[in-house]
Design a protein with these regions (language model features):
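Positively charged, aromatic-enriched patches within helix-turn-helix-type DNA-binding elements
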Residues: 107, 112, 154-220, 225-227, ...
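Residue-level recognition of specific faces of alpha-helices
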Residues: 65-68, 77, 86-89, 93, ...
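Short, well-ordered turn and helix-capping elements at secondary-structure junctions
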Residues: 43, 66, 70, 94, ...
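Structural detector for helix-capping/boundary residues
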Residues: 118, 144-146, 151, 186, ...
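Residue-level signal for beta-strand positions within conserved beta-sheet cores that form or flank
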Residues: 11, 35, 83, 144, ...
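Short, Lys/Arg-enriched segments at the junction into DNA-binding effector domains
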Residues: 11-14, 125-182
């Protein structure tokens, strides 16, 4: 099979796939190419980490069980470097603890094998779509001391900028657009992720916890027991 172009300007974007099973890597490559993406494949974690730094892909698909460095460690190092490229874990592991650990490290989604290659390509497209297409005139959102700029995709707690992953940003923005409205976990999965995550509603809880930890005392997020989440409406 000929190599898929890796020039991100020639296609919809470059996707880096870190997968040590050749058959699975080729299958992912084929479906991503059909969707219009360039694809670069690495077979071990160390090479994948170096390639991510060098190529600056639009998104990364990481197998958890990679040789050299596993996918979890690759994601951990990326986030430690303040690299917020969208990361989707692709793995045979289906244990809830593994899923939660991956999400807590800043992964945007978690896909377990066997998976539908077409759905995987759709999830990549969904993550990338959320980072683009915001009208230039869309005003910043403010709730309490938290300010979110949907155009530049930046979040501030007071005067300090807070680094969020793509999904953390989108989740916070969705809640801040309707202060006081309570969303169920199922609603948030449908409206923010656009599909049912393999990690289930637990993925919402993990991302909410991560946002709270990063915003600290200024976090406007409120848990409504037995229902879901909301942001505190500003006081008048």
């Amino acid at each position: 099979m000929p190599d898929v172009p890796t020039d991100p300007n020639a296609v919809r974007g470059l996707i880096l796939v870190a997968e040590d099973e050749a058959a699975i890597a080729d299958l992912i490559r084929m479906y991503l190419a059909k969707a219009g993406y360039g694809v670069h494949i690495e077979k071990d974690g160390a090479a994948a980490l170096a390639a991510i730094r060098r190529l600056k892909p639009a998104a990364v698909l990481l197998d958890v069980g990679l040789p050299e460095l596993d996918g979890v460690e690759v994601c951990r190092r990326l986030r430690a470097e303040q690299n917020w490229v969208p990361v989707l874990f692709v793995t045979a592991r289906d244990d809830e603890v593994d899923r939660v650990v991956g999400l807590e490290l800043g992964a945007d989604d978690y896909v377990t094998k066997p998976f539908s290659p077409r759905e995987l390509a759709a999830r990549v497209t969904g993550v990338l779509r959320r980072t683009k297409g915001v009208p230039d005139a869309m005003p910043p959102l403010e709730v309490g001391d938290v300010r979110l700029d949907p155009v530049e995709r930046r979040v501030f707690s007071g005067t300090e900028e807070v680094a969020l992953t793509v999904t953390e940003f989108d989740l916070l923005a969705h809640l801040m657009r309707r202060p006081g409205r309570v969303y169920s976990r199922e609603q948030l999965l449908s409206e923010v992720w656009g599909y049912a995550s393999v990690a289930g509603t637990r993925t919402v809880d993990v991302h909410i916890a991560q946002i709270r930890a990063k915003l600290g005392a200024t976090s406007p997020l409120r848990t409504v027991r037995g229902v879901g989440y909301a942001v505190e409406a500003p006081r008048r």
